[in-house]
């Protein structure tokens, strides 16, 4: 599972040849490429749009709809971001589209209805949820079931030996509704690799940089 947020900055910083990195990932058994509308202000998706046609091995790809762009996770956000993401990626469809974060202030029916329409148009195969609490996952599933809309089948969330909240309630919810769990941040931002000699050391780049 290859996430394209922080890795993009590394590739640019060290002038690494992008397509060789992706080929190495696929050659060594990787299959799933993960990006998002907001990653590096769209640069990640544009980079993938350049690289994907050069890859010689099969892959699957996922992107995400984020409420922070329009200020709401609604139908407008879904249509705008899905279509722009596909244009950046130079694809007609992707394997999975995640709702990146929940938006408790906006009724979720609007974005779910739009995602169902986009799914019917063939823009993606699977609906995913990312960073949603268990109760909202259950709510989303039942709304989709009631309307006959595409249901979520995969969840993406933080999980590592230091961040284990998923074990309390989330895992049972995912098992109950049949969602796969893709964990991000498995090495706690590099903390578990021994990269930082002291807990007081501050990262100079990556997810946990003070910005």
Question: What positions do the PLM features span?
Answer:
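Beta/alpha (TIM)-barrel catalytic core signal, keyed to glycine-rich beta->alpha loops juxtaposed to Asp/Glu
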Residues: 102-211
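Conserved, mostly hydrophobic/aromatic
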Residues: 25, 33, 48, 61, ...
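N-terminal binding-site loop/beta-alpha segment at the start of enzyme catalytic domains
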Residues: 1-59, 92
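A short, structured active-site edge motif that brings together acidic residues
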Residues: 58-70, 97, 156-158
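Short acidic, glycine-rich surface-loop motifs adjacent to enzyme active sites
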Residues: 94-95, 100-102
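Short, acidic/polar
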Residues: 10-25, 73-90, 108-113, 137-142
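Acidic (Asp/Glu)-rich catalytic clusters
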Residues: 26-27, 49-60, 83-92, 116-120, ...
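A short acidic, helix-capping loop that chelates divalent metal ions and anchors anionic groups
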Residues: 2-8, 68-72, 192
């Amino acid at each position: 599972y290859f996430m394209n947020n922080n890795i993009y900055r590394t590739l640019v910083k060290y002038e690494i040849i992008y397509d060789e990195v992706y080929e190495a990932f696929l050659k060594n058994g990787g299959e799933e490429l993960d990006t998002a509308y907001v990653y590096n202000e769209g640069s990640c998706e544009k980079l993938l749009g350049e690289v994907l046609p050069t890859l010689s091995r099969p892959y699957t790809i996922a992107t995400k709809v984020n409420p922070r762009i329009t200020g709401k996770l609604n139908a407008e956000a879904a249509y705008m971001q899905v279509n722009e993401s596909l244009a950046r990626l130079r694809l007609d469809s992707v394997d999975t589209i995640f709702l990146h974060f929940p938006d408790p202030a906006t009724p979720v029916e609007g974005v779910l209805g739009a995602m169902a329409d986009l799914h019917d148009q063939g823009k993606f195969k699977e609906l995913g949820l990312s960073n949603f609490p268990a109760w909202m996952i259950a709510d989303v599933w039942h709304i989709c079931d009631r309307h006959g809309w595409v249901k979520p089948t995969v969840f993406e969330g933080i999980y590592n030996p230091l961040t284990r909240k998923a074990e309390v309630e989330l895992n049972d919810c995912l098992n109950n509704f049949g969602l796969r769990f893709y964990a991000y941040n498995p090495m706690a931002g590099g903390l578990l690799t021994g990269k930082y000699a002291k807990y007081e050391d501050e990262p100079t780049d990556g997810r946990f940089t003070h910005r």
